[in-house]
């Protein structure tokens, strides 16, 4: 069915991934299993009807999980190492080739820390939840372990299981605690995400059984396989669909505005802060690292899709009158920079994509938390019904302003650094021809210009628009409380810290990004050299395992 032999256009190269460094202590297994085990004990927590005990218990579990991940980083992770660290490998079902294999490198460690950090704050954001609190916090904690597993596991089948594990909690959190259209939003979410994840299973099985013999699904094994180019292209296309739904990539994005439109504040934080990053991480881990030959062909498409994300979502956000949907489309727009960075074949651009995921995780979580806090007071999401609330909520206005400035990439904040790195990486690296780079940079800049327009106009409408007399008369229209200030403050510390001193984060993953881009550039050089010398006047069929001639690549590379 697949071409399993290297073809004449051989751009399939061994991954040359360094050998994993074994863990002295099972940090990552503990960070995965501890919140899952903690969630299983939630039903046994004494409950007086208001869920006070279970709230404190969930916060304890989430904070402890965060401390475990911090311990893993401080005690067992060396940023200067390119390869896998904190590696644990235990045979699970050897006859099926399934191994409990976990580890972390520069691609995964920052996202593991982000996951545990955002989840702890989401538990604090869920403090007012009074409807079925035990079930709510059970799902939050189970989701915590599942999402950490997505970034930590190093086995394709384990990755698929972890990917599926976090779907059910999100579905239930939407379907039970969502808004009026919660059933529709939850069903749409599960259809999109569960349906597309079938491609992960198919690609994983195909790669694990490649070449005959005993199946092996571990990433280190797959990275050193010489997959045929046609095989890589088929796997890459399927995985791009699966991960494109999560990122999300336009036009696979329509589930996200509906999900955000019905979710509660803590679920917003998990969706924007963590869930979308799973798609970007998986594109780097699988598409770019395990399938370099196909990545050389698909990278220009990723860049074009990134530009479409940026412009389309920014324009759509500008037209939205619903506050949640406006911020949801803003998230889609910002994730377009991740696609451009991944497709740039530039160390600086790819590093910018990684930083953009971290930055957006923090900024997106802060904005959506503020959306939830504002809705709790106004009981409306329509911008034309919120006018003048700045008179009674001055601290809330200040928090909104700072977080919005972070989202529009104000210098001194993390979003500015990440977007600047993506632009600089694309423009300065000569992998692509100069006209292509200029056109892409110019189009992406349109989105950068639109962002402050729709965000600042949003602030004006909420806080200084035409006064809604009935709304202003409500006594529950109170200013930000200490818990809310603490949550936003906790998110702003890394946002501003990274913006002022980016190396505190970029040094965590620079070595891994350098190795990844070096292997991908070797692949693209073979595309350029071979296509220019042998295939410049031919139409090459992908079905024959050969790559098409792409004249957007610079011949100097």
Curated annotation (Swiss-Prot):
EC number: 7.1.1.-
UniProt entry tagged with the keyword Signal: no
Subcellular localization(s) per the UniProt record: Cellular thylakoid membrane
GO molecular function annotations of the record: NADH dehydrogenase (ubiquinone) activity; ubiquinone binding
Location, primary (coarse class): membrane
Protein keywords: Membrane, NAD, NADP, Plastoquinone, Quinone, Thylakoid, Translocase, Transmembrane, Transmembrane helix
InterPro entries cross-referenced by the UniProt entry: NADH_Q_OxRdtase_chain4, NADH_Q_OxRdtase_chainM/4, NADH_UbQ_OxRdtase, ND/Mrp_TM
An annotated GO BP: electron transport coupled proton transport
Keyword Thylakoid: yes
Coiled-coil ranges from the UniProt annotation: none
Family: Belongs to the complex I subunit 4 family.
Task of the protein: NDH-1 shuttles electrons from NAD(P)H, via FMN and iron-sulfur (Fe-S) centers, to quinones in the respiratory chain. The immediate electron acceptor for the enzyme in this species is believed to be plastoquinone. Couples the redox reaction to proton translocation (for every two electrons transferred, four hydrogen ions are translocated across the cytoplasmic membrane), and thus conserves the redox energy in a proton gradient.
Designated name of the protein: NAD(P)H-quinone oxidoreductase chain 4
Organism: Prochlorococcus marinus (strain SARG / CCMP1375 / SS120)
Lineage: Bacteria, Bacillati, Cyanobacteriota, Cyanophyceae, Synechococcales
């Amino acid at each position: 069915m697949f071409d399993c032999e290297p073809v004449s256009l051989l751009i399939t190269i061994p991954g040359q991934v360094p050998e994993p460094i074994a863990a002295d202590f099972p940090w990552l297994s503990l960070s995965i299993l501890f919140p899952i085990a903690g969630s299983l004990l939630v039903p046994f927590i004494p409950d007086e009807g208001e869920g006070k005990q279970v709230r404190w218990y969930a916060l304890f579990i989430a904070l402890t999980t965060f401390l475990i991940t911090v311990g893993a980083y401080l005690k067992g992770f060396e940023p200067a190492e390119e390869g896998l660290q904190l590696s644990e490998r235990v045979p699970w079902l050897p006859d099926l080739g399934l191994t409990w294999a976990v580890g972390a490198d520069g691609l995964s460690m920052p996202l593991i820390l982000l996951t545990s950090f955002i989840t702890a704050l989401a538990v604090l954001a869920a403090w007012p939840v009074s409807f079925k609190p035990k079930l709510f916090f059970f799902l939050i904690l189970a989701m915590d372990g599942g999402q950490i597993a997505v970034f930590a596991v190093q086995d394709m089948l384990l990755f698929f299981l972890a990917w599926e594990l976090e779907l059910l909690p999100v579905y239930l959190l939407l379907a039970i605690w969502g808004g009026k259209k919660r059933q529709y939003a939850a069903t749409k979410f599960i259809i999109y995400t569960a349906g597309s994840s079938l491609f992960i299973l198919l690609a994983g099985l195909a790669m694990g059984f490649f070449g005959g013999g005993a199946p092996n699904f571990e990433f280190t094994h797959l990275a050193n396989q010489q997959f045929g180019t046609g095989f890589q292209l088929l796997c890459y296309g399927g995985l791009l669909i699966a991960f494109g739904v999560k990122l999300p990539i336009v036009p696979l994005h329509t589930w996200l505005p509906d999900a955000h439109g019905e979710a509660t504040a803590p679920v917003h934080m998990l969706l924007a802060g963590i869930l979308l990053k799973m798609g970007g991480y998986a594109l780097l881990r699988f598409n770019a690292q395990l399938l370099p030959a196909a990545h050389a062909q698909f990278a220009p498409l990723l860049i074009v899709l990134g530009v479409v994300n940026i412009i389309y979502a920014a324009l759509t956000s500008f037209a939205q009158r619903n506050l949640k949907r406006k911020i949801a489309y803003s998230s889609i727009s910002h994730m377009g920079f991740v696609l451009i960075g991944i497709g740039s074949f530039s160390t600086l651009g790819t590093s910018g994509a990684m930083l953009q995921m971290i930055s957006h995780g923090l900024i997106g979580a802060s904005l959506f938390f503020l959306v939830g806090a504002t809705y709790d007071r106004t009981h409306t999401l329509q911008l034309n019904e919120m006018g003048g609330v700045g008179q009674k909520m001055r601290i809330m206005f200040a928090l909104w302003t700072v977080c919005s400035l972070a989202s529009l990439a104000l210098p001194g904040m993390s979003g500015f650094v990440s977007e600047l790195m993506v632009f600089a990486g694309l423009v300065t690296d000569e992998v692509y021809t100069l006209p292509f780079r200029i056109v892409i940079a110019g189009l992406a800049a349109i989105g950068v210009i639109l962002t402050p327009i729709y965000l600042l106009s949003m602030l004006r409408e909420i806080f200084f628009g035409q006064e809604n007399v009935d709304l202003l008369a409500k006594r529950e229209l109170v200013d930000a409380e200490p818990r809310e200030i603490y949550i936003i403050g906790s998110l702003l510390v890394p946002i501003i810290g990274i913006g002022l001193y980016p190396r505190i984060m970029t040094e965590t993953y620079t070595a891994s990004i350098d190795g990844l881009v070096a292997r991908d550039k070797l692949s693209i050089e073979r595309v350029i050299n071979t296509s220019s010398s042998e295939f410049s006047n031919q139409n090459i069929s992908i079905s024959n395992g050969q790559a098409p001639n792409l004249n957007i690549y610079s011949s100097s590379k």
